[in-house]
Amino acid sequence: MIEIRFHGRGGQGAVTAANILASAAFKEGKYVQAFPFFGVERRGAPVTAFTRIDDKPIRIKTQIYEPDVVVVLDPSLLDTVDVTAGLKDGGIVIVNTEKSKEEVLEKLKKKPGKLALVDATGIALEILGLPITNTAILGAVAKATGLVKLESVQEAIKETFSGALGEKNAKAAEEAFNKTVVYEL
């Protein structure tokens, strides 16, 4: 089983991202689970969401404490939250940032096995006209993890957002897939 933990802020779409990733994996015949964890429910407050993906039925219903993959939608969280808490050895960290690999590693409490960086905010602003990074970051997740195909992510996005909005969000995921830089550490 692969466990993914998303870190974002209220209003950024971390919960939607977790659900879309689960839908994409389900399309590929996997068993999935996606759910949020809310502390103080307000716009801008830290939000955590989770996705589990497996080849077998998933029976556990707890939060994810030892993720294989951590996805950070808001880079300012690197200064306030230990996003690598419980990260499995050799785990993958995916960060929406313009910063360098060295700058990001300096902020992580645990060194991942793989680090993926993409300016999902820049991509979202360019394509969507809004700094909502959840669909763009899923392109980075597809590239860095290989858990799902980009096409499955795009299909799931178009099912979540209809019409032109779905097309634009699918394009944002593709752009992020192409621009994500993955470092083996």
From Swiss-Prot:
Pfam families: POR. It is an enzyme of class 1 (oxidoreductase). Its EC number is 1.2.7.1, 1.2.7.7. It catalyses: 2 oxidized [2Fe-2S]-[ferredoxin] + pyruvate + CoA = 2 reduced [2Fe-2S]-[ferredoxin] + acetyl-CoA + CO2 + H(+); 3-methyl-2-oxobutanoate + 2 oxidized [2Fe-2S]-[ferredoxin] + CoA = 2-methylpropanoyl-CoA + 2 reduced [2Fe-2S]-[ferredoxin] + CO2 + H(+). InterPro entries: Oxidoreductase_gamma_subunit, PorC_KorC, Pyrv/ketoisovalerate_OxRed_cat, Pyrv_flavodox_OxRed_cen. Keywords: Oxidoreductase. Gene3D superfamilies: Pyruvate-ferredoxin oxidoreductase, PFOR, domain III (3.40.920.10). One of its GO terms (molecular function) is 3-methyl-2-oxobutanoate dehydrogenase (ferredoxin) activity. PANTHER family: PYRUVATE SYNTHASE SUBUNIT PORC (PTHR43366:SF1). Heterotetramer of one alpha, one beta, one delta and one gamma chain. This is Pyruvate/ketoisovalerate oxidoreductases common subunit gamma. It comes from Thermococcus kodakarensis (strain ATCC BAA-918 / JCM 12380 / KOD1). The gene is porG.
